[in-house]
Amino acid sequence: MQLALTRTRWTLAAAVAILAAFAVASGTLWQVQHRADKIAVAMTGGDIARAPDLIRRYGCAGCHTIPGIPGGDGQVGGPLQDIKRRVYVGGVAVNSPDNMIKWIVSPQTFSPRSAMPATGISETEARDVAAYLYSR
């Protein structure tokens, strides 16, 4: 009987420890993502929350793999994860928020033969999309 109680206590203690570790890890991940979001918004002046709808509306996911976008698994254009770590936008312009926004609005300005179409997205909308991409 005493052995059974000891096992139960150890099992409960282990479960509590695992849950506590999970809570700490989840909180840390949330803090990291929240910080990345704040930095991306400051860099671009965009609104991350509006980006998923814009990405769907303008068909970005039809060509690109985009993290966090359901169905964002296109294979025509380059994948859009870790944009903040890239040296170039579209392979031709130095990666900066201004260049990213200009590229999203009018890729042919940088590369006349680019396969990426001008979608008609506004500069404000491009800022939102850029903020989202830089935050991921």
PLM regions: where:
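C-terminal capping alpha-helices of c-type cytochrome domains
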Residues: 4-31, 109, 115-136
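Short low-complexity stretches enriched in small and charged residues
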Residues: 15-18, 34-41, 70
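Extended interaction regions within the primary functional domain
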Residues: 1, 30-36, 64
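Short pre-active-site segment immediately N-terminal to redox-active cysteine/selenocysteine motifs
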Residues: 56-62, 67, 84, 125
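Internal, well-ordered alpha-helical scaffold/interface segments
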Residues: 49-53, 61, 78
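Extracytoplasmic electron-transfer domains, predominantly the class I c-type cytochrome c fold
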Residues: 71-136
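Electrostatic cytochrome c docking/interface patches
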Residues: 31-56
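Terminal targeting segments of Actinobacterial cell-envelope proteins
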Residues: 1-3, 80
